[in-house]
């Protein structure tokens, strides 16, 4: 089982330089854990691509369908008071935005407060650094401009 943040899920939905590596990683362990808002965050990134003309309406429909298939199989960590407390702490000790702190807090909750027992997959350097400092083994995906998968 691995925790995937939104930046790591995106290469599974759109073609990026890291898509093959991300797909190999998910094939090696299909047990995916994500934060509750991951699907929304990914849909937002896809909408930015469509608005920026990097995607056609057809590309968008294909990507959203792919995202929905992934979402039907993953396990989501839902919002809780404990998760919020962790996120508040994380924004104070790491240079994270609120959404990234929620991602990392969700991973900590998923790991039952034992980060060394859960891999954290991300394409976000700042989030990766914070995750390492919190004790996670991080799988870093380097990304370039996305294109339709």
Language model features: what each stretch is:
Residues 1, 105, 109-149:
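Acidic, PIN/NYN-like endoribonuclease modules and their adjacent C-terminal/linker elements
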Residues 1-38, 49-62, 136, 146-149:
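Short, well-structured N-terminal submotif of metal-dependent ribonuclease cores
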Residues 28-29, 70-73, 134:
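Structured helix-beta-strand junction loops
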Residues 34-40, 99-102:
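Aromatic- and histidine-enriched alpha-helix N-cap/loop-to-helix transition segments
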Residues 37-93:
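Active-site-proximal, substrate-binding regions of enzyme catalytic domains
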Residues 73-126:
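Active-site neighborhoods of divalent-metal-dependent phosphate/nucleic-acid chemistry enzymes
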């Amino acid at each position: 089982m691995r925790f995937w943040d939104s930046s790591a899920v995106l290469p599974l939905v759109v073609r990026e330089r890291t898509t093959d590596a991300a797909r190999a990683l998910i094939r090696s362990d299909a047990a995916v854990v994500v934060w509750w808002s991951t699907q929304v965050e990914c849909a937002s990134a896809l909408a930015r691509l469509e608005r920026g003309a990097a995607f056609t309406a057809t590309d968008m429909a294909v990507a959203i369908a792919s995202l929905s298939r992934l979402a039907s199989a993953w396990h989501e960590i839902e919002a809780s008071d404990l998760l919020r407390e962790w996120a508040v702490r994380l924004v104070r000790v790491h240079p994270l935005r609120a959404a990234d702190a929620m991602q990392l807090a969700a991973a900590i909750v998923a790991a039952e407060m034992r980060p060394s027992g859960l891999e954290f997959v991300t394409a976000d350097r700042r989030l990766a650094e914070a995750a390492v400092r919190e004790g996670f083994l991080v799988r870093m995906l380097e990304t370039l401009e996305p294109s339709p998968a």
